[in-house]
Amino acid sequence: MSDYVTINIEDGVADVRLNRPEKLNAVDGKMFRAIVEAGESLKDRSDVRVAVLSGNGRSFCAGLDFSSFQAMESSSGENSENSAPIDLLEGRMTHMGQQAAWVWQELEIPVICALEGHALGAGFQNAMAPDIRIVHPDTNM
């Protein structure tokens, strides 16, 4: 599991947190992969009854990390650290950003998104994927 997303499981609750507080949890290629891996890791867990997705720090997710755009553009292969490659999901071609949202829809357990601070762009997309959203009144969406 990546340091970009942490998972703590206790009493049947998977506490899944985006973990780039210094960047307001903005996503880049590594973060997209880490989100997908986190969701995938919960699929076959019989000890998890619910997942709560949130962000460490003062924001859920401020969207794309613009500083990673140039690295994504210049990467020519999927193995580049910051690339967000097109991949297969249930037989369809999808972008890693779509997979980061879709993975929460695939879980057979309820997924709750706890939002505060910002949920912009890619962060908004990831906030809309879970089954339930709990939103702080000052959240910017």
Residue ranges and their predicted role:
Residues 47, 55-100, 119:
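Glycine- (often His-adjacent) and acidic-residue-rich active-site loop
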Residues 1-56, 72:
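Conserved CoA-thioester-binding segment of acyl-CoA-metabolizing enzymes
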Residues 96-141:
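Glycine-rich beta-to-alpha active-site loop
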Residues 19, 25, 63, 117, ...:
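Conserved phosphate-binding and hydrolysis motifs of nucleotide-dependent enzymes
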